[in-house]
Amino acid sequence: MAKPAARPRKKVKKTVVDGIAHIHASFNNTIVTITDRQGNALSWATSGGSGFRGSRKSTPFAAQIAAERAGQAALEYGLKNLDVNVKGPGPGRESAVRALNSCGYKIASITDVTPIPHNGCRPPKKRRV
């Protein structure tokens, strides 16, 4: 005898007040991830996933759009306060932080967590154009 089909339970979104926005700004792309204090991802967006391709991915405007998309998606969790961790040398660093600020979040701190080598790996050779 077949079991009756179990009704799918509606997933309840938990409410989170404080979160961390991780902005990874490389020379080619910008990735914005918003997590809770424990590091569980609530939302994320990238410049490439926001419709920008090629060299337009690495622009500050593309980083702004990606941060706005991640910020709007995280608002569903009731997020109010953000700490911002910025990593990387890319051109979208400041514009992504400004976009999160314009989404209505109260930004408590901005921290630069760019990894700096203590004479580690050899850097790539210089470009000859």
Curated annotation (Swiss-Prot):
One GO molecular-function entry: structural constituent of ribosome
Keyword Signal applies: no
GO cellular component: ribonucleoprotein complex; ribosome
InterPro entries on file: Ribosomal_uS11 (IPR001971), Ribosomal_uS11_bac-type (IPR019981), Ribosomal_uS11_CS (IPR018102), Ribosomal_uS11_sf (IPR036967)
Disulfide bonds: none
Keywords per UniProt: Ribonucleoprotein, Ribosomal protein, RNA-binding, rRNA-binding
Superkingdom of source: Bacteria
One GO biological process term: translation
Function statement: Located on the platform of the 30S subunit, it bridges several disparate RNA helices of the 16S rRNA. Forms part of the Shine-Dalgarno cleft in the 70S ribosome.
Family the entry assigns: Belongs to the universal ribosomal protein uS11 family.
Subunit annotation: Part of the 30S ribosomal subunit. Interacts with proteins S7 and S18. Binds to IF-3.
Protein name stated in the entry: Small ribosomal subunit protein uS11
The species this protein was found in: Pseudomonas putida (strain ATCC 47054 / DSM 6125 / CFBP 8728 / NCIMB 11950 / KT2440)
Organism classification: Bacteria, Pseudomonadati, Pseudomonadota, Gammaproteobacteria, Pseudomonadales
Gene: rpsK
